[in-house]
A protein has these predicted regions:
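Internal, well-ordered alpha/beta segment that forms a basic, Gly-enriched binding/recognition surface
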Residues: 140-174
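Residue-level detector of conserved catalytic or cofactor/ligand-binding positions
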Residues: 202-209
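Active-site gating loops and adjacent loop-to-helix segments of metal-dependent hydrolytic enzymes
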Residues: 172-198
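Active-site environment of divalent metal-dependent phosphoester hydrolases
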Residues: 21, 81-86, 108-111, 148-150, ...
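Short catalytic-loop micro-motif centered on adjacent basic/acidic residues
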Residues: 47-50, 74-78, 140-141
Length: 209
């Protein structure tokens, strides 16, 4: 059964939470689980921003199909190649074979090594400061290497001033139906896990100055 959240007039959360996983990346204890965040933009073109880990693939594909409502998927934006963002990318391409993939050159090269589909036939490459228009919404792309892998980029919706930030502001912890800041007490519910996430994953990958 689908479980989605309408974020704005035309943006939907289609991710999922995993409360069964004991260790994130087989290293970090996650007693409160973890969430995988993916979004769909329904503009003149349809856009999927990231996929999810294989562990929640069933929920994700139900969510995606529900939000698309029979529309084709035109674009997939890949911000980061870690499995919690991209493990289901190949299956998404199989289900939506006409979708183009918006990424950068490093992500394209990693896709060549990780997956079997022809990325070169569908890749639209972004570099620092490039923009892409989907209709009402225009996205700008900013490279964010080592946050926390070398290929990472982020998307900024110039229309709504929304940042899709990959892992930059991540935290451990499953989402219990609340996605907006005024629905949670961040300092009570998330700040400790956000600090642990930053110190475990982001801080250790910062480039040496």
């Amino acid at each position: 059964m689908h479980c989605t959240v309408k974020m704005t007039e035309d943006l939907y959360w289609v991710g999922a939470s995993d409360r069964r996983l004991a260790l994130f990346e087989s290293v970090y204890p996650i007693p409160r689980g973890v969430s995988y965040n993916a979004y769909v933009l329904l503009d003149e073109k349809t856009v999927l921003l990231d996929t999810v880990d294989q562990s929640v693939a069933g929920q994700f594909f139900e969510n995606l199909a529900h939000v698309l409502g029979g529309r084709p998927l035109d674009y997939i934006v890949v911000h980061h190649m870690e499995p919690d963002h991209a493990k289901t990318l190949e299956e998404t391409v199989r289900r939506y074979p006409e979708a183009k993939i918006i990424c950068n050159a490093k992500i394209r090269d990693m896709i060549r090594n990780y997956f079997t589909f022809d990325i070169d036939a569908r890749a639209i490459l972004m570099a620092e400061g490039d923009t892409y228009c989907f209709g009402k919404h225009t996205f700008a792309y900013v490279m964010a290497p080592m946050v926390h892998w070398p290929e990472v980029m982020v998307s900024y919706d110039l229309t709504t001033r929304t940042l899709f930030s990959a892992d930059a502001f991540g935290t451990f912890g499953a989402i219990n139906g609340a996605l907006f800041a005024d629905e949670v007490d961040f300092f009570r519910d998330y700040v400790d896990e956000a600090r642990r996430y930053y110190l475990s994953l982001i801080h250790i990958s910062e480039p040496t100055r």
